[in-house]
Amino acid sequence: MAKIQDDNKLYTCLRPFIDHHLRKSFRRYEVIGQENIPQNAACIFGVNHTNTLMDALVPLSMNSEKKVFIARGDIFKKPLIAKFMHFCRILPIYRIRDGFKSVRDNNTEIIDKAADVIHDNVKLFLFPEASHRTKHSLKQLSKGIFHIALKANEQFGHEKPVYLIPTGIEYGDYFRYRSTALISFGEPINVTEYVNNHKDENEAVIINGLREMLTERMSKLISFIPDNEEDYNAIWEMTKMKSKFRLYEPLAQRLERNQKTIKEILEWKEREPEKAKETFERVDKFTKKRKKKGISIFSVTNENIGGTVFWKTLVALIGLPAYIATVISTLPIWLVTMILKKSFKDKAWGNTISFATETILHPLLMILCIVLAFCNLSWEQATLTSIIYYISYEFFVDATEFLRRWISDVKWCFNKKLRAMSREL
């Protein structure tokens, strides 16, 4: 019987296409810490889970290596979906909430398959939080990833070491298409060595030890605010205000500044809890008013708002004809995207929907554009038209975001009350 990690010609043909469109889904896409991935070892990657299917596509597209993923079992209920997921090299794993029978009947086999994947030197990616959540935090890690690691170590740990690789994905925005994505790989955990050093302990104790280590190391790879932090929203708002946005800085540097700011805020809260509580309440009020007015945090942190409004107004006026042209020419993509997004209650699916509609519709419209252009124009004009249309949707998305921020800047510039509130924070 064919293994999930075996070569598949159709998958191999489609993979570069998917990778290309995934990269187009982000204005910037960066990977750091690849030197932390051990060579000649069995590697299991534990990834934070914040952005639905994008969390799998982002590490998939970082290079052309084979990768297998594990997802929660409830999405495999329909046979057609199960076949598609298998084609995409995604294995199911079942949780107690899926029913004890599902766990008992399926997980032993799945764990064996997962161990076989890493035995064949194929990278295995899991989301140990078990479900996605758009927060800069971590839920308690489920045991599945550790059961796989221990099973693999039991089967072939004497041949090659088994490692858990903490992996963090930091998005510039969970909800806006073509934001930024940073993948970070942290210090690996040598499971084989850990088990050998704790031979006298039972499996439950070993799993708890590994869980603590993986949680700690994953938290160092994201803008981490403790999950039990009741003032999460205020802390994150203050972090964005204090860290400030620098357009072209490396994403790793931006993450480092966020982490430093969060640490300072939490330490200040511990030193002066009463003052912090009062400040957090004022921050929450400010945030609600800011969002109600449609003002972006980028406007709030802009130290030269007047100058920014001036040059953005000029750019908006000059670029308006091109923007209107892309609004019309890419209408099928953004209209379908908008309709589909409205059918999902969970806004976290927004970027996945945007990626899917662009990946399917843009190539079809591109083919139509090429046919019409070369049938009706000179080859020079047709070539230029095709090139322009190829970048038209990216231009449309980025220009729409530019206009949103420009409008936000104008609102912020003329809202004296809110600006006074921000100065008091």
Predicted feature locations:
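Soluble catalytic domains of membrane acyltransferases
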Residues: I4-V205, A322-L425
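Long, charge-rich alpha-helical interaction segments
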Residues: E212-S299
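Short hydrophobic alpha-helical module
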Residues: L221, F286-K289, K293, L320, ...
